[in-house]
Amino acid sequence: MNAPDESGESSWPVLAARVGALLPLTSLDPSAISFLQGDGLQGTWFSACSGGADSVLSTLLAFAHFPGRSGAFTVAHFNHCLRGDASSGDEAFVHRLAEGLGVSFTSARGMGTTGDEASLREERLAFLSKVTNGHQTAIILQGHQRDDIAETFLWRLARGAGLAGLAAPRPVRRSGNMVFVRPLLTISREEVRRVLGSVGATWREDDSNTSPIYLRNRLRMGTLEAWRKDSDREVGAGTVRSRRL
C-alpha cells in the first residue's frame, strides 16, 4: 500500500491509539512485554521500521502502550537503495511516520548493490550498532510476527541448526548493548494487515519480498503454503507452541 495523504499522516497518534485498543498488551508476546515493562524502561528505545506493515504496527503499538517513552524513542530506518524510487519512498514514508508521532528519526543508506539475505541483514545490524553506539542499553523494537517463526524454522532447518537456532526468533535477545525485542510474535501476518486496515493505517509494500531470488521468500510462498494446506491444524500456532517447549 502507498503512504497516506497529508491528512492521514497528521493523524498517526490517533491511528496508534486505535491499534492499541484493538491489540492490548495482553495480546502481545508476554516475554517481550514483561521485559519492556521492567528492565526495558531503563534503556533508550529504537523502533527498526522498514515501512512495511509489521514494523509500522510495532511502532504504533509502542507509541500507544508506552507513551512515557516518546521522549526517548527513535524510529530507525535503513535504506538498502535496491529499488530506486520505491526505496526512497519507503524512507520518506517512515520519516513522515516519525514526524507525525512527534518522535526522533534516524536513517542511513546502503551502497545499492544487490546482496544475499545474510549480507543485507548484516548491513542493517551494522546500522543499528552505529546509531545505538554510546547508549548503555538500547532497546531495538522489531516487527517480527508469528508467521516468521515458521519461516525461520524451515530456513534454519535446511541449513542445519541446533535447538536454540530452531527456536528463533526469540521475543527478547541481547547482543552487546542492544536488546532486540519482538512483541508481535503472537500476531499473524494476516492479523497485522487486518488491524492496520481496519483503522485506516497504511504501509509500504516491498516487491522484493515476493522475489524468488531469496530462499526465505521461496519458503514462505511455496513450502510454507503447502505445509499449511496439508496440515490438519494451524501451523503458526503449532510452531509457536513448539518453540516454547
What residue ranges belong to the model's regions?
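ATP/NTP-dependent adenylation/nucleotidyl-transfer catalytic domains that generate, transfer
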Residues: 214-245
